[in-house]
């Protein structure tokens, strides 16, 4: 018989840096999940990522307090800032441009995010990433 799902928890945790402090501890504690077990498993699974890279994770909690989790690809905004070599985007993206990014870098990011994105094809996914770049104050050039 399949386990009964008690709920889902969506978090964004730094790769290799999951610990019982907020936001991880309180979110898992509410559902009665073993916090240290999750932290060890998450840190082991995210070893391949750069330390500190934000990784979205969806935790499925079952009624017997066991859990499974699925990691996603890092947010497009983080990947764009990393590719452009910036710390943050523009507070006023329509007037203040903070940097430029090449279309080839946008394509690499779209390929990285392809598993998590629902775009019909690569061109649509690239346009979505370009829109994110523009909303951050980045100029996309060929």
From Swiss-Prot:
GO molecular function terms listed in the Swiss-Prot or TrEMBL record: large ribosomal subunit rRNA binding; structural constituent of ribosome
Alphabetically ordered keywords of this record: Methylation, Ribonucleoprotein, Ribosomal protein, RNA-binding, rRNA-binding
Record keyword Ribonucleoprotein present: yes
InterPro entries cross-referenced by the UniProt entry: Ribosomal_uL11, Ribosomal_uL11_bac-typ, Ribosomal_uL11_C, Ribosomal_uL11_C_sf, Ribosomal_uL11_CS, Ribosomal_uL11_N, Ribosomal_uL11_N_sf
Signal peptide extent: none
SMART domains listed in its UniProt record: RL11 (SM00649)
PTM summary: One or more lysine residues are methylated.
GO CC annotations on file: cytosolic large ribosomal subunit
CDD domains in UniProt: Ribosomal_L11
GO biological process assignments: translation
Superkingdom of the organism of origin: Bacteria
Keyword rRNA-binding assigned: yes
Pfam families referenced in this protein's UniProt entry, alphabetically: Ribosomal_L11, Ribosomal_L11_N
Subunit details: Part of the ribosomal stalk of the 50S ribosomal subunit. Interacts with L10 and the large rRNA to form the base of the stalk. L10 forms an elongated spine to which L12 dimers bind in a sequential fashion forming a multimeric L10(L12)X complex.
NCBIfam families according to UniProt: L11_bact (TIGR01632)
Similarity comment text for this entry: Belongs to the universal ribosomal protein uL11 family.
Its biological purpose: Forms part of the ribosomal stalk which helps the ribosome interact with GTP-bound translation factors.
Protein name listed in UniProt: Large ribosomal subunit protein uL11
Gene: rplK
